[in-house]
A protein has these predicted regions:
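Short, well-structured N-terminal submotif of metal-dependent ribonuclease cores
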Residues: 1-39, 53-60, 129-136
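PIN-domain endoribonuclease scaffold, especially VapC-family toxins
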Residues: 24-92, 96, 100, 121
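Charged, amphipathic alpha-helical interaction segments
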Residues: 12, 28, 52, 87-90, ...
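Acidic, PIN/NYN-like endoribonuclease modules and their adjacent C-terminal/linker elements
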Residues: 2, 71, 103-136
């Protein structure tokens, strides 16, 4: 199953946020056997920016990115996908880009903490906890 992970799922563990255990459990399932983990290209820059700002260390942020790249696949998107996102009517453009990337990689499910932002999605949207309950 192709799991498309929103940026917030990748950052839960680093920032030790509520729900980090479930997010990390979903990431652990992205081992390429039963499930593969997919992210948008721009997730890398967003994650780098946030981790560097928190840690005040570019090397720490780069290591975080390298860790992601050790298991994640990148959704291949095009100009047309970006245009679709821009014209989608979604309130948050970054979420629209995430959604366009999930469609581009033919994701089976989008895993996010912001399920309300994806209410018009044709792809099922779940929190990490919902996913783990449905696919233990």
């Amino acid at each position: 199953m192709k799991l498309f992970l929103d940026t917030n799922i990748l950052l839960d563990g680093y920032f030790q946020r509520t729900g980090a255990v479930a997010s990390d459990a979903v990431i652990a399932k992205c081992d390429g056997t039963t499930h593969s983990g997919w992210i948008a290209w721009h997730t890398l820059s967003n994650a780098f920016y946030l981790v560097r700002g928190h840690s005040k260390s570019a090397p720490t942020a780069l290591q975080f990115i390298e860790d992601i790249l050790s298991w994640a696949e990148l959704a291949e998107t095009t100009k047309a996908d970006a245009q679709q996102a821009a014209g989608s009517g979604m309130k948050d453009f970054e979420d629209a880009l995430q959604y366009a990337a999930a469609i581009a990689c033919a994701a089976d499910v989008i895993i996010t903490r912001n399920t309300a932002d994806f209410k018009t999605s044709v792809i099922p949207v779940m929190t990490p906890e919902e996913f783990l309950a449905a696919f233990p």
